[in-house]
């Protein structure tokens, strides 16, 4: 093994904050740093990193160690793998012990697979520039906006025919069996033949697999072919481009998610080095956990604006919202992907597009509404209930509450209704809830007419009210047929008996329950009965005069008729002074 002196030299050279900050989001707290522990689920940070002591400790689960131990525990590295990674990072030479001189330490399977992938990557890069048949792949990359510097930066390559690949690997002492273990073959055939190769790296830059894109329309298979699952290639956890974007993501707590590897690399190369893509499979909860470890709070979804892209945005957005991340959906113009949009509009155009992103809930409602052939009240109710069920899983109660309020605003329904649907009150026994019936709207004319009739009906021995009503009005002045019928009956009774009609006899005249309720249910101030009666008479007289004037115009040939009506109205107002005798404190004529 390596000498103790060289290992001590490595330990003293390691900056533990630098190492751990590439994997978790650290926040300074005095002389130490704290974070949510990556080894157990927690919301309050209990994971403390001590730079002076070069160690970490979690007060929640008890995890403890140095940078070497962190890589072993967090990434599953062996001790040898961890020290080799760190020695490369901090440029420290590890010295073999004398007895091991000329002896290569035994390699584990993971290290062997990384070595095979590294050799294959080097060969693929060579093929892209030197094989005649690769010129079409190179032209395709240039056409997509990849410069030679970009191609070199991301180690892009070309997959040759199977026979040439096997020959090259054999020269490097790599057997076909080892290539099968590393995931280069499916059903005995080389997976990446005649395709552009995108190497996939882990967080520390090791080549752990490949994604191969076809560039000729007549090529067989899907657009992308990926390395199958291997001991070092776990698609459910790998975020393509993370080795280039990790630092900025952890620093700014935001990430841009795209669908394809080419899109991801073009985004990073254009300055958006907080971009990643899911590797070959659908975006999963494991991917979300990887982002959570970096402290991501804001997620921008930059997917193709087709049906598949929108469905992916709905699913991925919900996963991120559930992890208490704020999700925004950026809508690309139809027919564009991030790569083509950058080529046409440039970085400034994409920045402007990102600034116009919709929040996830607005996008969700818009997509769901458009999925209905017809969107009516029933569909609206179903959509609100579906959205509520989804929102209730989005993190803390406060976040859920705020999203429910936003839902109410988007769907134009009362907030209290949405909140009650989300949190129904459960009682021990069912209660009879009174159902409020819709109260028919009552016309003001009916109210005025029933006010006059109420005064007449409840005037008792005050026959002056009956006399005044008889003097000023006739049954035809009442518009409602029931009011007209009752007024005629009461005046007829008064003229015959010189007294008020008994209440029960008056009720028998009515067949409309609404009029009877207006006469009996509404409160009547009997002490101000005379005033109420006079005011109601005045309203009735004004209505009658307006109706008489309505058909008239200002034409000269009818001017005399209009003046005649006006004289009648003035006389009518003068005649009201008779009513004021009933109430000395009231002056009806100004």
Curated annotation (Swiss-Prot):
Belongs to the DnaG primase family. This is DNA primase. A zinc finger (CHC2-type) spans 37-61. One of its GO terms (cellular component) is cytoplasm. It catalyses: ssDNA + n NTP = ssDNA/pppN(pN)n-1 hybrid + (n-1) diphosphate. Residues 253-333 form the Toprim domain. Binds 1 zinc ion per monomer. It comes from Chlamydia pneumoniae. Its EC number is 2.7.7.101. Monomer. Interacts with DnaB. HAMAP family: DNA_primase_DnaG (MF_00974). RNA polymerase that catalyzes the synthesis of short RNA molecules used as primers for DNA polymerase during DNA replication. Disulfide bonds: none annotated. SMART domains: TOPRIM, ZnF_CHCC. Contains an N-terminal zinc-binding domain, a central core domain that contains the primase activity, and a C-terminal DnaB-binding domain.
């Amino acid at each position: 093994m390596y000498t103790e002196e060289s290992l001590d030299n490595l330990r003293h050279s390691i900056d533990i904050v630098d190492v751990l900050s590439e994997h978790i989001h650290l926040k300074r707290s005095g002389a130490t740093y704290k974070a949510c522990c990556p080894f157990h689920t927690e919301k309050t940070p209990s994971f403390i990193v001590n730079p002076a002591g070069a160690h970490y400790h979690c007060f929640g689960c008890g995890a403890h160690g140095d940078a070497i131990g962190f890589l072993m525990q967090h990434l599953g590295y062996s001790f040898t793998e961890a020290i080799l990674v760190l020695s490369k990072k901090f440029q420290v030479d590890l010295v073999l012990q004398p007895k091991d001189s000329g002896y290569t330490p035994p390699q584990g399977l993971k290290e062997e697979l990384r070595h095979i992938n590294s050799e294959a990557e080097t060969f693929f890069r060579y093929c892209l520039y030197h094989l005649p048949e690769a010129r079409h792949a190179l032209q395709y990359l240039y056409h997509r906006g990849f410069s030679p510097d970009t191609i070199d930066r991301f180690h892009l390559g070309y997959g040759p025919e199977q026979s040439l690949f096997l020959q090259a690997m054999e020269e490097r002492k790599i057997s076909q069996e080892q290539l099968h273990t590393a995931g280069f073959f499916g059903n005995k055939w080389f997976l990446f033949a005649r395709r552009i190769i995108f190497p996939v790296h882990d967080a520390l830059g090791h080549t752990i697999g490949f994604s191969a894109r076809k560039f000729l329309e007549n090529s067989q298979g899907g657009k992308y072919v990926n390395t199958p699952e291997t001991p070092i290639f776990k698609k459910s956890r790998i975020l393509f481009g993370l080795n280039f974007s990790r630092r900025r993501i952890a620093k700014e707590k935001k990430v841009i998610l795209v669908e394809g590897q080419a899109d991801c690399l073009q985004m990073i190369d254009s300055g958006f080095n907080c971009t990643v893509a899911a590797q070959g499979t659908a975006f999963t909860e494991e991917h979300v956990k990887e982002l959570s470890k970096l402290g991501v709070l804001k997620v921008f979804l930059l997917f193709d604006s087709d049906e598949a892209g929108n469905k992916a945005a709905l699913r991925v957005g919900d996963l991120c919202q559930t992890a208490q991340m704020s999700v925004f959906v950026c809508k690309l113009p139809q027919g564009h992907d991030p790569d083509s949009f950058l080529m046409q509009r440039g970085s400034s155009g994409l920045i402007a597009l990102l600034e116009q992103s919709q929040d996830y809930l607005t996008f969700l409602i818009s997509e769901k509404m458009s999925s209905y052939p017809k969107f009516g009240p029933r569909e609206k109710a179903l959509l609100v209930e579906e959205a509520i069920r989804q929102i209730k899983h989005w993190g803390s109660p406060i976040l859920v509450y705020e999203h429910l309020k936003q839902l109410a605003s988007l769907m134009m329904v009362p907030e209290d209704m949405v909140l009650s649907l989300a949190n129904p009150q459960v009682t021990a026994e069912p209660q009879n809830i009174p159902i409020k019936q819709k109260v028919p709207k009552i016309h003001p004319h009916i109210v005025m007419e029933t006010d006059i009739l109420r005064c007449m009906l409840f005037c008792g021995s005050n026959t002056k009210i009956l006399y005044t009503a008889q003097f000023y009005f006739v049954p035809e002045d009442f518009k409602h047929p029931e009011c007209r019928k009752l007024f005629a009956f009461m005046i007829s009774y008064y003229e015959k008996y010189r007294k008020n009609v008994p209440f029960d006899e008056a009720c028998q005249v009515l067949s409309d329950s609404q009029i009877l309720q207006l006469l009996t249910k509404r409160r009547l101030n009997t002490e101000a009965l005379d005033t109420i009666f006079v005011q109601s008479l005045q309203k009735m007289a004004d209505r009658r005069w307006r109706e008489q004037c309505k058909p008239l115009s200002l034409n000269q040939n009818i001017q005399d008729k209009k003046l005649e009506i006006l004289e009648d109205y003035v006389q009518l107002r003068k005649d009201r002074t008779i009513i004021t005798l009933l109430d000395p404190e009231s002056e009806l004529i100004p």
